[in-house]
Amino acid sequence: MNCIEITSLEDQGLEVYGTLTEAQLRNKLEPEKGIFIAESPKVIHVALNAGYEPLALLCERKHIKGDAASLIERCGDIPIYTGERELLTSLTGYTLTRGVLCAMRRPMPKPVEEVCRNAHRIAVIDGVVD
């Protein structure tokens, strides 16, 4: 387990949880570097089951052996940033849902031809983000 105790909001690796905007996380210029944040153990498990790659976890210390234990086991040797609830709330700007967030690699967009290949109906929705 690669636990990293957060001592400062300036610690390297934390920017994905607090200072980067959605546009920066999405990384339109280099989509292979795109990241999204999964919130709560349930959502993170669903993303892992769907094959998404975890990059780092942000977890309240008390959840490492609790709600996050099975996630930590599934995620392998990724950084697990941990600290007290108040510090993590200061970092993210809100109280973590069930005490866990996971930075995950955003999938590359599929070509239109692949998406439409076996479709019977296609809905085109403009202006929707995430």
Q: How would you label these PLM feature ranges?
A:
Residues 63-65, 86-89, 97, 107-110:
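A short acidic, glycine/proline-enriched capping/turn motif at secondary-structure boundaries
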Residues 35, 55-57, 79-81, 99-102, ...:
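Structural motif
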Residues 4, 42, 49, 80, ...:
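RNA substrate-binding interface of SAM-dependent RNA methyltransferases
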Residues 28-30, 73, 93-95, 114-118:
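Solvent-exposed alpha-helices and their adjacent loops that cap or buttress functional pockets
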Residues 1-67:
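Boundary-proximal intrinsically disordered activation/regulatory segments immediately upstream
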Residues 39, 60, 83-84, 105:
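A secondary-structure boundary/capping signal
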Residues 72-93:
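A glycine-rich helix N-cap at a beta->alpha junction
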Residues 39, 90-96, 106, 130:
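Generic structural "secondary-structure junction" signal
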